[in-house]
Curated annotation (Swiss-Prot):
Family annotation (Gene3D superfamilies): 3.40.50.920, 3.40.50.970
Keyword Cell membrane: no
Top-level EC class as recorded in UniProt: oxidoreductase
EC number(s) from the headed UniProt entry: 1.2.4.1
UniProt-recorded name of the protein: Pyruvate dehydrogenase E1 component
Gene this protein is translated from: aceE
Organism field: Buchnera aphidicola subsp. Acyrthosiphon pisum (strain APS) (Acyrthosiphon pisum symbiotic bacterium)
Subunit organization: Homodimer. Part of the PDH complex, consisting of multiple copies of pyruvate dehydrogenase (E1), dihydrolipoamide acetyltransferase (E2) and lipoamide dehydrogenase (E3).
CDD domains, A to Z: TPP_E1_EcPDC_like (cd02017)
Length: 887
């Protein structure tokens, strides 16, 4: 900040202005004073437009003054002992794991910087789930997991054997490196690594709690969502990208606590600036309540004595790189290089020893300051709150890591460093014991033991805790309820329309219709879903304060507080985060929701795959509908929109069940089975990805007895009987029609018999094949299991064709009974044109399928190669054209 800002050329005039405002506040109140100040600012802006603007940053001091603080409600002495024991055990856990030389890693410094913050929350704020409400939802910062394990150990929730197996999980008794519900399903609720997903998901989790409450499905009014974040993590676009949504939704049930230890993994976050000020400006500008906790109580007297204002000026001027350096040195260094900058500030500490200067603490390490910030945050109404807590990375670790750039990488500490930590936190471990790296515990009925449990009892129980299954029972629709879709459709429709009809049937089911959550990223009209606007309404926390332009239309844009549709705008990350909050409501709220997020399929896994991977970790249950799928089917939108690979991406997530249906009845069977698996008695921890298309065509009735095949991934659609050779053709989605057309050509022109199979899921077939092979390998003396696809198909030459990359259908090559298997797919970049031209370009139309089948027959000498050559000429195929993968 400029020196000129502090160079008061007329202190008397300044005093007059300040006294005038103080007088207005006393006589007429803050509102009048605020109005007058705003008028002054407006005048200043008019006269100095290019220079003057209101500042979004305040002085580098605490938002809450000492005079406005409440008394601390806890026992500070006992809490310090407990906190010190947790610090120690967290360090011992990592060091003991490191001694095994397994290259396990582990992080020490992040928790040491935030231990006080967490302990204030554990002792006074975190409400556990109880019979009255769902409790608070806490997104713990990923790198501080050892500290949470250490507390759970003192509480008796984790055993010594478990914490001794930190990052050693294969044998089933260890603890995960970071919060992972998949690995610790009764402990962690939310995965918060990779970084950036925690704050994003916390915002939409808070929004979803409001959604449940406003729809009168569940009372969530007392629940708070806490998100603990690092200042370095805030550089992730996801960390800050949705903060305006929290303001728009008035999420006063959301509190961000950002641990501003000024360091990221390699060095300072903003060494040449001030990350706290940067974040304050960003959040304040977005409309958040900002509470800065910069200095601890030991600074209070100095700030009170600072009549010149030079101390606050110095605090404002000092950059983060210097603040970090100060905490890596000692009191004498701080006296000389911080306070020594100005005579006034140097004189402030002239009667203090170097040790007293060194003990001047930062706000995030002061329980009283943190308590008041959290209390103020909980009391804030109609807006979210962010607490910016100034801390020291590696706090208490001394020369080993405190304030050092290497702090994040410290995983081993020599004996002198361990002794320093023991002495720093008064840990009752003798020199004889210290080499054993012992944990410390509290005897049952000791003051500390009783305090830990009594504080948690007051707050309803222990956290983190995760419910792995919902406790109620849902009455789900049976397949017969979708009878209208199992029959031949009177008009040509797309599978997207079939999905909408399935959704409408479910929305008429009185048992579960209130649990349905359609989620859209501003494409409802594209998918033909606008009819739902009036039927179930679009959720809006503010209702609808305007008259919609299309109010007279049947499907007008109807927003309401009890609306069911989550319309997230052009915001795939936000829509997916809402989907994730709803998809885990069965666990977080013991209230299962049945959700369908429909979107352009290419803007799913490709754009937000990290979030869908986290959904797998979080054991999400629900449906993802990849609409307008297929490289050649969304024909006019071109390269960026045409999806030929989302199924390749979805198969990387083990509990994502993927389907590419071709017919309306397949869509109905798949969704009904998904409801049974996810929400029925077995409550499987899976979620579904179903691709649908926007191409209208004839939808036949469901053949008898194909339900099992549809769900497992393949069934025989029909056989066309010829008199010569035999082949098998398999396909999925839009290209199954090309497969059927090719079979007709093979019969008509070559009298070839063709078995046609609809493959609803190449991925599930491949997984089944892999499972069979694994079982057979490990059970050599037992009868081999046979892959499902091998049971269904025969040994005749086989051609597979899909609207996706060849790799999609290549998955099952090893498991089909035929030795001759050729795959056609849409490798390459998409482009705009008619569907016929695109399918010719990507070589997946009926003619290419015929050529592929004839070629396989020629390879086994069933027909002559001349037949293939003639067919290429007959169908006007350019044999020398560039491979579409490269063109």
């Amino acid at each position: 900040m400029s020196e000129n800002l502090y160079n008061d050329v007329d202190p008397i005039e300044t005093r007059d202005w300040v006294q005038a405002i103080e007088s207005v506040i006393r006589r007429e109140g803050h509102k009048r004073a605020h109005f007058l100040i705003e008028q002054v600012l407006k005048t200043a802006k008019i006269n100095r437009k290019e220079f003057f603007r209101s500042s979004f940053t305040s002085d580098y001091i605490n938002t809450i003054s000492r005079e406005d603080e409440y008394e601390y409600p806890g026992n500070l002495i006992l809490e310090k002992r407990i906190r010190s024991a947790i610090r120690w055990n967290a360090i011992m856990m990592v060091l003991r794991a490191s001694k095994k030389n397994l290259e396990l890693g582990g992080h020490l410094s992040s928790f040491q910087s935030s231990a006080t913050i967490y302990e204030v929350c554990f002792n006074h704020f975190f409400q556990a789930k109880n019979h009255k409400d769902g409790g608070d939802l806490v997104y713990f910062q990923g790198h501080i997991s050892p500290g949470i394990y250490a507390r759970s150990f003192l509480e008796g929730r984790l055993s010594e054997e478990q914490i001794d197996n930190f990052r050693q999980e294969v044998d089933g008794i260890g603890l995960s490196s970071y919060p992972h519900p998949k690995l610790m399903p009764n402990f962690w609720q939310f995965p918060t690594v990779s970084m950036g997903l925690g704050p994003l998901c916390a915002i939409y989790q808070a929004k979803f709690l409001k959604y449940l409450h406003n729809r009168e499905l569940k009372n969530t009014s007392k629940q708070i969502v806490y998100a603990f974040l690092g200042d370095g993590e805030m550089d992730e676009p996801e960390s800050k990208g949705a903060i305006s949504i929290a303001v728009r939704e008035k999420l006063d049930n959301l509190i961000f606590i950002i641990n501003c230890n000024l360091q990221r993994l390699d060095g300072p976050v903003v060494g040449n600036g001030k990350i706290v000020n940067e974040l304050e400006s960003f959040f304040y500008g977005a409309g958040w309540k900002v509470i800065k906790v910069i200095w601890g109580s030991r600074w209070d007297c100095l700030l009170k004595k600072d009549t010149s204002g030079k101390l606050i000026q110095l605090m404002n001027e000092t950059v983060d790189g210097d603040y970090q350096t100060f905490k890596s040195k000692d009191g004498a260094y701080v006296r000389k290089y911080f306070f020594g900058k100005y005579k006034e500030t140097y004189d402030l500490v002239k009667d203090m020893t170097d040790e007293e200067i060194w003990k001047l603490n930062r706000g995030g390490h002061d329980p009283k300051k943190m308590f008041n910030a959290l209390k103020k945050a909980k009391e804030t109404k109609y807006k979210p709150t962010v607490i910016l807590a100034h801390t020291v990375k590696g706090y208490g670790m001394g020369v080993i890591a405190e304030g050092k750039n290497i702090a994040h990488q410290i995983k081993k500490i020599n004996i002198n460093g361990i002794i320093h930590i023991r002495d720093r936190f008064n840990i009752p471990v003798s020199n004889d014991e210290i080499n054993k790296l012992p944990y410390v515990t509290f005897k049952k009925n000791s003051e500390e033991y009783c305090y830990i449990h009594s504080q948690r009892k007051k707050l309803g129980g222990y956290i983190p805790f995760r419910l792995s299954s919902f406790t109620g029972k849902l009455i789900l629709p049976k397949l017969i309820d979708f009878q209208s879709l199992l029959e031949e459709q009177k008009k040509d429709i797309s599978t997207t329309v079939a999905f909408i009809r399935v959704l409408n049937i479910i929305l008429k089911n009185n048992s579960i219709k209130h649990l349905i959550v359609p989620i859209i990223a501003d494409e409802a009209r594209t998918f033909g879903m606008e009819g739902l606007f009036r039927k179930i309404g679009i959720y809006s926390s503010s209702g609808q304060k305007y008259t919609p332009q299309d109010r007279e239309q049947l499907a007008y844009y109807k927003e309401e507080k009890k609306g069911q549709i989550l319309q997230e705008g052009i915001n795939e990350l936000g829509a997916a985060s809402s989907w994730l909050a709803a998809a885990t409501s069965y666990s977080t709220n013991d209230f299962p929701m049945i959700l369908f997020y429909i979107y352009y399929s290419i803007f799913g896994f490709q754009r937000i795959g990290d979030l869908f991977w986290a959904a797998g970790d979080q054991q999400a249950r629900g449906f993802l509908i990849g609409g307008t799928s297929g490289r050649t089917t969304l024909n006019g939108e071109g390269l960026q929109h045409e999806d030929g690979h989302s199924h390749i991406q979805s198969l990387t997530i083990p509990n994502c069940i993927s389907y590419d249906p071709a017919f309306a009845y397949e869509v109905a069977v798949i969704i009904q089975d998904g409801l049974r698996r996810m929400y029925g008695p077995s409550q499987e921890n899976i979620y579904y990805y179903i691709t649908t298309i926007n191409e209208n065509y004839y939808m036949p009735a469901m053949p008898i007895g194909v339900e099992e095949g549809i769900c497992k991934g393949i069934y025989k659609l029909k056989t066309l009987h010829g008199t010569t050779s035999k082949v098998q053709l398999i396909g999925s989605g839009a290209i199954l029609r090309s497969v059927c057309e090719a079979a007709e050509i093979l019969l008509k022109d070559y009298s070839i018999t063709t078995d046609i199979y609809s493959v609803t899921s190449f991925t599930e077939l491949a997984r089944n094949g892999e499972d069979c092979e694994r079982w057979n390998m490990l059970h050599p003396n037992e009868k081999n299991k046979i892959a499902y696809v091998k049971q269904i198909m025969n040994k005749n030459p086989t051609v597979a064709a899909t609207d996706y990359m060849k790799l999609f259908a290549e998955q099952i090559r090893h498991y089909i009974p035929s030795q001759e298997y050729h795959v056609l797919g849409t490798d390459g970049f998409g482009r705009s044109d008619s569907r016929d031209k695109l399918r010719d370009h990507f070589e997946v139309n009926a003619y290419y399928i015929v050529i592929a089948a004839l070629n396989l027959l020629a390879n086994i000498n069933d027909i002559k190669k001349k037949v293939v050559e003639d067919a290429i000429m007959k169908f006007n195929i350019d044999a020398n054209k560039i491979n579409p993968r490269l063109s």
